[in-house]
């Protein structure tokens, strides 16, 4: 691979750290804002160079950046995430935690100091977040959430659902679908348990 300039290395490092933290790639505007570029064109130019030099691959979709292995390197550093059943992207369904398989995930993107599991999505309530029925979502285990996170939420200890999280006040939480045809779910905070945050998506084509 061709050597990178200092700025190109900084952009690449930002993309890596952003993906590790959020589970998806930054947008051009995220890059522009972080580096105080005057226009999206400057950020786009850096992505073109990184792709030409073989460090990333881009798809013609929003946030469509994929990290490429360095020359001579393969993704040998992997960890296994158990497939722990299914999750509702629709009405909440009874939580199922039987491990049926394991999915390898590269530690290049997902730090080893966390635990992960995956769930098969059922339903279309998150379709506008590009999460389709049949997809597998990769979940980082944690018992807390920030506004805007997509989480696995357990309601009343039995029913699990995949929704976007929003804290209304000390007593109530809103679970928001990414589908305009579906209703939000308002839940008492003490009736809700966060099981993890979505950090990745796996789709079998």
UniProtKB/Swiss-Prot annotation:
GO BP annotation list: DNA repair; DNA replication; negative regulation of DNA-templated transcription; proteolysis; SOS response
EC primary class: hydrolase
Family: Belongs to the peptidase S24 family.
A molecular function GO annotation: sequence-specific DNA binding
Keyword Transcription regulation in annotation: yes
Active site, per annotation: 125, 163
DNA-binding region, residues: 28-48
Name of the featured protein: LexA repressor
Highest taxon, organism lineage: Bacteria
Record keywords: Autocatalytic cleavage, DNA damage, DNA repair, DNA replication, DNA-binding, Hydrolase, Repressor, SOS response, Transcription, Transcription regulation
Protein's organism: Petrotoga mobilis (strain DSM 10674 / SJ95)
Residue(s) at site: Cleavage: 89-90
Function: Represses a number of genes involved in the response to DNA damage (SOS response), including recA and lexA. In the presence of single-stranded DNA, RecA interacts with LexA causing an autocatalytic cleavage which disrupts the DNA-binding part of LexA, leading to derepression of the SOS regulon and eventually DNA repair.
Assembly behavior: Homodimer.
GO CC, alphabetical: protein-DNA complex
Reactions catalysed according to its record: Hydrolysis of Ala-|-Gly bond in repressor LexA
EC number(s) given by UniProt: 3.4.21.88
């Amino acid at each position: 691979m061709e050597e990178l300039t200092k700025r190109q290395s900084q952009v690449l490092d930002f993309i890596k750290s952003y993906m590790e933290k959020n589970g998806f790639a930054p947008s051009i505007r995220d890059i522009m804002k972080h580096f105080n570029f005057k226009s999206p064109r400057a950020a786009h130019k850096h992505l073109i160079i990184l792709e030409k030099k073989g460090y990333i691959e881009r798809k013609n979709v929003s946030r469509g950046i994929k990290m490429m292995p360095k020359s001579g390197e393969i993704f040998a550093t992997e960890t296994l995430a158990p497939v722990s059943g299914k999750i509702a992207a629709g009405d909440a369904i009874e939580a199922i935690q039987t491990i049926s398989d394991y999915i390898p995930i590269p530690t290049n993107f997902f730090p080893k100091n966390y635990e992960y599991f995956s769930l098969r999505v059922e339903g279309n309530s998150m379709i506008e977040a590009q999460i389709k029925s049949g997809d597998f979502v990769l979940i980082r285990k944690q018992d807390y959430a920030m506004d805007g996170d997509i989480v696995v939420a357990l309601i009343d200890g039995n029913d699990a659902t995949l929704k976007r999280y929003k804290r209304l006040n000390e007593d109530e939480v809103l679970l928001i679908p990414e589908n305009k045809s579906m209703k939000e779910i308002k839940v008492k905070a003490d009736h809700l348990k966060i099981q993890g945050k979505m950090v990745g998506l796996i789709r079998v084509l």
